[in-house]
């Protein structure tokens, strides 16, 4: 997927925030990966390259690290809005 410069900037900010939140919780990349049932290389890639809401891992990281998907200013297309609504519904019912 080719990202606009604005979306690329948002994805990179997300990666920086993931790293800061993970380190703030005292977790290693491997530790966070175990919690999320994924590979540490996926966490490392998310921190280095960032992610967009098209990735399931984007929302899993938001859930685990207390990040808000809306804070990253991604283009508000219908798919994105539906994913945000789904995430909101899930987090409100599970907490």
Regions found by a protein language model. Name each.
Residues 1-24:
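A short, Lys/Arg-rich alpha-helix, primarily the initiator
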Residues 18, 32-33, 43-46, 72:
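Conserved hydrophobic/aromatic packing and binding residues within compact polymer-binding modules
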Residues 16-35, 60, 85-94:
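Short basic helix-loop element that most often maps to the first helix and adjoining turn
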Residues 41, 52, 65, 81-83:
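Short Asp/Glu-rich motifs
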Residues 36-53:
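Recognition helix of helix-turn-helix/homeodomain-like DNA-binding domains
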Residues 3, 71-95:
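Short, charged recognition helix plus adjacent turn
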Residues 49-63:
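Short, basic-rich loop-to-helix N-cap that marks the start of a DNA-contacting helix
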């Amino acid at each position: 997927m080719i990202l606009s410069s604005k979306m690329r900037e948002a994805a990179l900010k997300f990666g920086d925030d993931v790293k800061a939140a993970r380190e703030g919780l005292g977790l290693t990349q491997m530790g966070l990966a175990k919690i999320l049932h994924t590979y540490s290389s996926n966490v490392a890639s998310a921190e280095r390259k960032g992610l967009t809401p098209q990735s399931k891992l984007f929302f899993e990281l938001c859930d685990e690290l207390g990040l808000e998907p809306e804070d990253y200013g991604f283009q508000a297309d219908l798919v994105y809005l539906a994913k945000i609504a789904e995430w909101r519904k899930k987090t409100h019912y599970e907490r």
